[in-house]
């Protein structure tokens, strides 16, 4: 009996751990096309009635083969995200994707995806990429970086701060990324800290960054753009 109880407990722990590690809930049917007009609020979207689903719920003419405009971006990049908000058929499937265009010397600034791991491949040009670990016991945050060329692949673990930078002075770069959530979210670090609405107290930020309040006030006065479309 004791042995049976032990194995039952082990199985339950494994089941709970599996659920805790999942980015998005696993689907319980073939598909669950998002009903974005439903008044019901759930974690994700409720399903559209299966009899009303058609092939266009799984299709989007996204024009990802076309270069995107980076000229209006201070960061020199343009992220075209295809998530459940644009493609209803992604609901419950735990995946999304993005095309990222980089101007010469452009970057996708340091940011995190709180709900997804990202895997990225370079289609054109060269990218300097990296991510930083969470706070370690020794007080360090380790930086992992790599220079990627066309066809190379790099993975950014879920929730960690990461970036991509085009080092070329005269050539643009293009990448495609896949993310392990239908709605991965993005928190651009500088935008969140210095461009929040309402502003974080300059007393807090001056102490945190060990600079005077004038530097904080100047940073908060800047326009912090969102390069994600």
Curated annotation (Swiss-Prot):
Glycans are attached at residue 78. Pfam families: Cupin_1. Its main location: secreted. Disulfide bonds join 32-47. CDD domains: cupin_OxOx. SUPFAM superfamilies: RmlC-like cupins (SSF51182). It is found in: Secreted, Extracellular space, Apoplast. Mn(2+) binds at residues 111, 113, 118, 162. Residues 62-217 form the Cupin type-1 domain. SMART domains: Cupin_1. One of its GO terms (cellular component) is apoplast. Keywords: Apoplast, Disulfide bond, Glycoprotein, Manganese, Metal-binding, Secreted, Signal. InterPro entries: Cupin_1, Germin, Germin_Mn-BS, RmlC-like_jellyroll, RmlC_Cupin_sf. PROSITE patterns: GERMIN. Residues 1-22 form the signal peptide. GO terms for molecular function: manganese ion binding. Belongs to the germin family. PANTHER family: GERMIN-LIKE PROTEIN SUBFAMILY 3 MEMBER 3. Oligomer (believed to be a pentamer but probably hexamer). May play a role in plant defense. Probably has no oxalate oxidase activity even if the active site is conserved. This is Germin-like protein 12-2. It comes from Oryza sativa subsp. japonica (Rice).
